[in-house]
Curated annotation (Swiss-Prot):
The keyword Membrane applies. The sodium/potassium-transporting ATPase is composed of a catalytic alpha subunit, an auxiliary non-catalytic beta subunit and an additional regulatory subunit. Interacts with catalytic subunit ATP12A. Interacts with regulatory subunit FXYD1. Interacts with regulatory subunit FXYD3. Interacts with NKAIN1, NKAIN2 and NKAIN4. Interacts with MLC1. Part of a complex containing MLC1, TRPV4, AQP4 and HEPACAM. Interacts with KIRREL3. Interacts with OBSCN (via protein kinase domain 1). This is Sodium/potassium-transporting ATPase subunit beta-1. This is the non-catalytic component of the active enzyme, which catalyzes the hydrolysis of ATP coupled with the exchange of Na(+) and K(+) ions across the plasma membrane. The beta subunit regulates, through assembly of alpha/beta heterodimers, the number of sodium pumps transported to the plasma membrane. GO terms for biological process: ATP metabolic process; cardiac muscle contraction; cell adhesion; establishment or maintenance of transmembrane electrochemical gradient; intracellular calcium ion homeostasis; intracellular potassium ion homeostasis; intracellular sodium ion homeostasis; membrane repolarization. It is found in: Cell membrane; Apical cell membrane; Cell membrane, Sarcolemma. Belongs to the X(+)/potassium ATPases subunit beta family. The lineage of its organism: Eukaryota, Metazoa, Chordata, Craniata, Vertebrata. The C-terminal lobe folds into an immunoglobulin-like domain and mediates cell adhesion properties. Disulfide bonds join 126-149, 159-175, 214-277.
C-alpha cells in the first residue's frame, strides 16, 4: 500500500518536472515557447481587429453632435425644487418643513449669480427683452468654445431670492423655477399669434418667446390654485429664444438655460392641489409615456 502511494507521488512529480526529458508539465521549453508565441500572436490579432473596428467607428461619430439627432425626443420641462415624488408639502410656520425645497433652489441658482457670470470671454449680454435665436456658427466644423448669454437673477422677481431668502415658502406663497431641458441644436418654435386662441394663455404675445402656463390639472384643482404670478425676461411668461440653440458641453460648458419663475400666491390651505405646467410650441411634443416631455405636474399642499 505504501509502495503504491509512493509510486503515485513519483508519477506526479515526474509529470510536473521530467528531468530526463527536460519537460515541464509534459512540454519542453521549445514547445512552451511555441504555444505561448501562438497565443500572443492570436490574441494580438484579435485586439488589433477590435481596436481597428473601434477606430473606424469613431471616425464616423462627431464628438460635438449626435449622428442620428432626428431620433431625439422633444425637450422635457422640469421644475426646481427637484423632488422625487413631485410633491411639495410644507407648513409656512415650520422652516424645517420647507428647508429642503429652499436649499434645492439655492443650489440650482448658484450659477446664475452675477459673480458667476463675470468672465467676458465666456459670457455676453444678449439684451433685456426676448429676441431671435442666436446662431454661433456650425456645430460640426467650427472649433473653439462659444460664448453664452447671461441671465439676470432679478428677472425672476419675487422668486429670485434677492429679497426673500425663503422664496415665498415662509409666507405660504411658494415659488418654483421652470426650465426647458437641454437638447443639442434645438430651436424652439413658439405658436403663431393667430393660433394662440387654441391655447389657454392669458399673456401678451411675443414671437420670440416660448410660452409656458401653469393651471390646475383636474377640474377640482382649477378653483383652488388661485392667483399665479410669472417672472421672466421682459415680463413674458416663457423662455426667450436668444438662448437657443444649445451647442453642447464641449462648445458651451458654461451654458445657462433661460428660466421662468412661478409663484402661487393664494393656494387653498390644507388641500392637495395638482398643478400642471405646460410649454406651448410648434415643435414641443407631449407623451403619455413621459410625463415630463413638454410638461410636468406637481402636487402642492400648504398645511396650516
Amino acid at each position: 500500500m505504501a509502495r503504491g502511494k509512493a509510486k503515485e507521488e513519483g508519477s506526479w512529480k515526474k509529470f510536473i518536472w521530467n528531468s530526463e526529458k527536460k519537460e515541464f508539465l509534459g512540454r519542453t521549453g521549445g514547445s512552451w515557447f511555441k504555444i505561448l508565441l501562438f497565443y500572443v500572436i492570436f490574441y494580438g490579432c484579435l485586439a488589433g481587429i477590435f481596436i481597428g473596428t473601434i477606430q473606424v467607428m469613431l471616425l464616423t461619430i462627431s464628438e460635438l453632435k449626435p449622428t442620428y439627432q432626428d431620433r431625439v425626443a422633444p425637450p422635457g420641462l422640469t421644475q426646481i425644487p427637484q423632488i422625487q415624488k413631485t410633491e411639495i408639502s410644507f407648513r409656512p410656520n415650520d422652516p424645517k418643513s420647507y428647508e429642503a425645497y429652499v436649499l434645492n433652489i439655492i443650489r440650482f441658482l448658484e450659477k446664475y449669480k452675477d459673480s458667476a457670470q463675470k468672465d467676458d470671454m465666456i459670457f455676453e449680454d444678449c439684451g433685456n427683452v426676448p429676441s431671435e435665436p442666436k446662431e454661433r456658427g456650425d456645430i460640426n466644423h467650427e472649433r473653439g468654445e462659444r460664448k453664452v448669454c447671461r441671465f439676470k437673477l432679478d428677472w425672476l422677481g419675487n422668486c429670485s431670492g434677492l429679497n426673500d431668502d425663503s422664496y415665498g415658502y415662509r409666507e405660504g406663497k411658494p415659488c418654483i423655477i421652470i426650465k426647458l431641458n437641454r437638447v443639442l441644436g434645438f430651436k424652439p418654435k413658439p405658436p403663431k399669434n393667430e393660433s394662440l386662441e387654441t391655447y389657454p394663455l392669458m399673456m401678451k404675445y411675443n414671437p420670440n418667446v416660448l410660452p409656458v402656463q401653469c393651471t390646475g390639472k383636474r377640474d377640482e384643482d382649477k378653483d383652488k390654485v388661485g392667483n399665479i404670478e410669472y417672472f421672466g425676461m421682459g415680463g413674458y411668461y416663457g423662455f426667450p429664444l436668444q438662448y437657443y440653440p444649445y451647442y453642447g458641453k464641449l462648445l458651451q460648458p458654461k451654458y445657462l438655460q433661460p428660466l421662468l419663475a412661478v409663484q402661487f400666491t393664494n393656494l387653498t390651505v390644507d388641500t392637495e392641489i395638482r398643478v400642471e405646467c405646460k410649454a406651448y410650441g410648434e415643435n414641443i411634443g407631449y407623451s403619455e409615456k413621459d410625463r415630463f416631455q413638454g410638461r410636468f405636474d406637481v402636487k402642492i399642499e400648504i398645511k396650516s
